[in-house]
Design a protein with these regions (language model features):
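N-terminal amphipathic alpha-helix/helix-capping segment at the start of soluble metabolic enzymes
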Residues: 1-44, 49, 92-100
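Structured core elements
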Residues: 40-42, 216, 261
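Alpha/beta enzyme core
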Residues: 47, 53-77, 81, 89, ...
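Short conserved micro-motifs at the rims of enzyme active sites and ligand-binding pockets
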Residues: 51-54, 271-273
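N-terminal glycine-rich phosphate/pyrophosphate-binding loops that anchor nucleotide-derived ligands
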Residues: 85
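Thr-Gly-centered strand-to-loop micro-motif
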Residues: 236-238, 262
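Short acidic/histidine-rich active-site segments
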Residues: 259-267
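C-terminal helical cap(s) of enzyme catalytic domains, especially alpha/beta-barrels
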Residues: 267-285
């Protein structure tokens, strides 16, 4: 378990230690692991107030426990990256866990889960400048397109600007697109084949160049049709339960799919340990 005292000592008495750790971090020589793919652990959910894993609405609420689970995942062979907000990535920096890892900074966390302004997803975490300054390998943004919510256009514009700014610094711009609707007052992502095709084509066209754009997409039906919508490289996200592994395996056979970005289903597996869940996911690569 990470030592909370050590983290607090650095944060209260030596805050410059964070920048020093980022500068000293050994960067990966490639985005890809020895398996030729990307295997990224996603841990940016808490900043949106999304703490649920499985049936526990506050599963991710204990930060030291979450860090311990992330460390366990990052230590497994074949895991070569992590996605997080500044607070989590800086804890991992102080713990010395980010050497040789592909580090992706999460950017727009302003669309807090369950709020009236959820679709107007402001860039409240990393920006392109801070990602480049820290020496990280990319930035990730969530793009939810709700035809009935005027906040969508602000998010579209912000994501387009972020793609351009990341590309100008030659780092990955990871876009996670959805068509979304409010159902009984809550935002729900449309996971039909047609909706994902439309979302991907919109995301692929963001920014002044797509040279550094990657897409982060969920498993839906007819993934071959979905992935045929663009030539951009893609990473598969999410999924829960036993069926997820079979779905990931099938998706990884598609030519544009370059790996996995998985969070809660590996960090809080329904059965077994974090190591067991991660090793099984890595075996698919």
């Amino acid at each position: 378990m990470p030592d909370l005292g050590d983290l607090l000592e650095a944060r209260t008495r030596r805050p410059d230690a964070i920048a020093a750790a980022a500068a000293a971090r050994k960067r990966p020589t490639s985005l890809f692991g020895e398996h030729g793919k990307l295997m990224i652990i996603a841990a940016d959910h808490p900043a949106r107030g999304a703490l649920r894993a499985g049936a526990d609405p506050l599963a991710m609420a204990n930060r030291v426990e979450l860090l311990d689970r992330i460390r366990s995942a990052l230590a497994r062979p074949g895991v070569n990256g992590v996605l997080g907000t500044p607070d989590i990535l800086e804890d991992l920096l102080l713990l010395g866990e980010l050497d040789d890892k592909v580090v992706i900074g999460s950017m727009n966390r302003g669309g807090l889960a369950g709020t009236t302004f959820e679709i107007d997803d402001r860039f409240t975490a990393f920006d392109a400048h801070s990602i480049a300054l820290a020496g990280y390998e990319g930035g990730k943004m969530l793009l939810r397109i709700d035809p009935d919510d005027p906040g969508t256009v602000a998010t579209l514009e912000s994501c387009g600007n972020a793609v351009s700014q990341l590309a100008s610094r030659r780092v990955m711009a990871m876009v996670e697109p959805f068509i979304s609707h409010r159902v009984d007052g809550r935002v729900r992502n449309d996971l039909t084949t047609e909706a994902m095709i439309r979302a991907m084509t919109v995301a692929a066209g963001l920014g002044t160049t797509s040279a550094y754009t990657w897409l982060k997409v969920p498993i839906v039906s007819e993934m071959d049709r979905v992935m045929a919508a663009t030539t951009l490289p893609a990473l598969i996200l999410g999924g829960e339960g036993e069926a997820a592994y079979a779905e990931w395996r099938k998706a990884l056979e598609l030519p544009t799919v370059q790996g996995l970005v998985i969070g809660r289903s590996l960090l809080y597996p329904a059965q077994g340990t974090v190591a067991d869940a991660v090793d099984r996911a890595v075996s698919l690569l």
